Amino acid sequence: MSATRRLQKELGDLKNCGVKAYENVECEETNLLKWTVLLIPDKEPYNKGAFKVGITFPVDYPFKPPKVAFETKIYHPNVDEEGKFCLPIVTAENWKPATKTEQVMMALLSLINEPEPSHPIRADVAEEFQKDHKKFMKTAEEHTRKHAEKRPE
């Protein structure tokens, strides 16, 4: 299956899957290799908003993983200020061509709902998460209210 056909199928599958964890799955009108997805976490403190995620597929997809990054700011120990994060499923050494974008989105949602402070990208936020969890929750909720996208009705 060519990359174009595979991406068209995955785009259709994601748009029609009925999962409430992500919505507004879109691709650029002239570029099937660039998508945006609205990620909708269901756990505090991130359940006060939604987060736009950009996905860029390489031309040799599915043999190489997509690049995925948050376009919406998020206060999270596993996401840096530029929206980058480490998710094993999309690293070159762990990527499998059979992996689908929906699996990537579910793994990312799991990371957002269940932070991993033992593997932080932002050590200061991870330390706050572990040592002053109440302050972390308050700061993350305020940050979410200020920066996140509106949750779909």
Curated annotation (Swiss-Prot):
Establish whether keyword Transferase is in the entry: yes
Phenotype of gene-disrupted mutants: RNAi-mediated knockdown very slightly reduces viability and brood size; phenotype is exacerbated on a mutant background which enhances the overall efficacy of RNAi. Increases sensitivity to paraquat and reduces lifespan at 25 degrees Celsius, but not at 20 degrees Celsius. Abolishes lifespan extension completely on an eat-2 mutant background. Substantially increases embryonic expression of sup-35.
- In its UniProt record, which GO terms are filed under biological process? animal organ morphogenesis; determination of adult lifespan; embryonic digestive tract morphogenesis; protein polyubiquitination; protein ubiquitination; ubiquitin-dependent protein catabolic process
Q: Which GO terms describe its molecular function?
A: ubiquitin conjugating enzyme activity; ubiquitin protein ligase binding
Ranges for domain UBC core come to 2-149
| Listed InterPro entries | Ub_conjugating_enzyme, UBQ-conjugat_E2_core, UBQ-conjugating_enzyme/RWD
Q: What are the UniProt keywords, alphabetically?
A: Transferase, Ubl conjugation pathway
- Describe its assembly: Interacts with E3 ubiquitin-protein ligase wwp-1. Interacts with RBR-type E3 ubiquitin transferase ari-1.1.
Q: Which family does it belong to?
A: Belongs to the ubiquitin-conjugating enzyme family.
Query: Could you tell me what this protein is called?
Result: Ubiquitin-conjugating enzyme E2 ubc-18
- Which organism encodes this protein? Caenorhabditis elegans
Q: Which gene encodes it?
A: ubc-18
